[in-house]
Amino acid sequence: MAGGTLYTYPDNWRAYKPLIAAQYSRFPIKVASSPPEFQFGLTNKTPEFLKKFPLGKVPAFEGNNGFCLFESSAIAHYVANDELRGSNNRLHQAQVIQWVGFSDSHVVPPASAWVFPTLGIMQFNKQATEQAKEEIKTVLGVLDCHLQTRTFLVGERITLADITLTCSLLWLYKQVLEPSFRQPYGNVTRWFVTCVNQPEFRAVLGEVKLCDKMAQFDAKKFAEVQPKKETPKKEKPAKEPKKKKKKKKKATPAPAPAPEDDLDESEKALAAEPKSKDPYAHLPKSSFIMDEFKRKYSNEDTLTVALPYFWEHFEKEGWSIWYAEYKFPEELTQTFMSCNLITGMFQRLDKLRKTAFASVILFGTNNNSTISGVWVFRGHDLAFTLSEDWQIDYESYTWRKLESDSEECRTMVKEYFAWEGEFKHVGKAFNQGKIFK
């Protein structure tokens, strides 16, 4: 085996994947995670590093013979042995890829949204956290059902599927999955504990203790962490004004390059896009401030604060409320897959967020579900028809404008925004919801 070097920062859960895989395959791998070999935030921004790894992200792997790999799952696949990849069984190989993709798409995003605020890495958002909890419940439910008659995810031995999902669930189990939360998912916890106690896992992770009490957002910890990130930006302009107090004209352009330097490639690409025409430019200014309502909805109680605010400030002359129902319920199978339809639509409609709000709900169970939602748009036309940027997935739904003063509209807004109520028009129980804001 040629071996190679893995660049990362200490305790990077993504780096655990290739490191555990290397324990099983006996692949010789050197870890560079501290000076002078590697310092995160400095080394990964140098021209030499970016030439090898253009995104500047870690973990990143450089083989002893000079080739380079990025993305933790790809690195783990490379350093693994055939058994971890699914042996010579094509079905097992496909199933390993399936669970690795499942981990990246369905576990990591909600896990990050829930756990990061408890670590002081991210600001707390009540609505995002509650939504993440519901998504994690769905994920754990899928895994629990699959593991009911299985020791491991694929076949009879540990594979990259087990390694990847264990690493993705690691911080959940360490920070927030307290006993009462994880109790309904006993098969998952049994499997997780089995994995982390394997010698190859313990060599990388050490002893893993499951949390006793769900960690909460710590404002003090967040305040301590955040200034460290901002320090480089503050130091540059602080020095320049002292030298250029009398030169007012030259002082203003000096800091200009800094924001551009801070943009990653995707942000630069977005900044370079031509500006689209505003479909609502012809409408008079509205007194209803959508962003303010979204703040209320995200951070305050829905029934006692957000909804009263909505109806107090909603301007029916400049805004409209629509009911949408998915046209093809007979095609909906697994509930987590149905939720992907909603999430995918939301992601592709990012340019509509500024002037819209929606609560879309999945009702029912596996192979017997429906999707419907309530949307709020600027103006009185169906928003999707007004811009090419917005013409995404909306034709898969039937749309009906609601009369904002009607009892039907008031009831629907209350039930869909609060995710609770009788939902008499649906005839199925609430499963889970998604918010577009």
Swiss-Prot record:
Disulfide bonds: none annotated. GO terms for molecular function: translation elongation factor activity. Pfam families: EF1G, GST_C, GST_N. Residues 225-240, 266-279 have a biased composition (Basic and acidic residues). Residues 241-251 have a biased composition (Basic residues). GO terms for biological process: translational elongation. The keyword GTP-binding does not apply. GO terms for cellular component: cytoplasm; nucleus. Keywords: Elongation factor, Protein biosynthesis. Residues 2-87 form the GST N-terminal domain. Residues 276-437 form the EF-1-gamma C-terminal domain. It comes from the Eukaryota. Residues 89-222 form the GST C-terminal domain. CDD domains: GST_C_EF1Bgamma_like, GST_N_EF1Bgamma. Residues 225-279 are annotated as: Disordered. SUPFAM superfamilies: eEF1-gamma domain (SSF89942), GST C-terminal domain-like (SSF47616), Thioredoxin-like (SSF52833). PANTHER family: ELONGATION FACTOR 1-GAMMA. EF-1 is composed of four subunits: alpha, beta, delta, and gamma. Probably plays a role in anchoring the complex to other cellular components. This is Elongation factor 1-gamma-B.
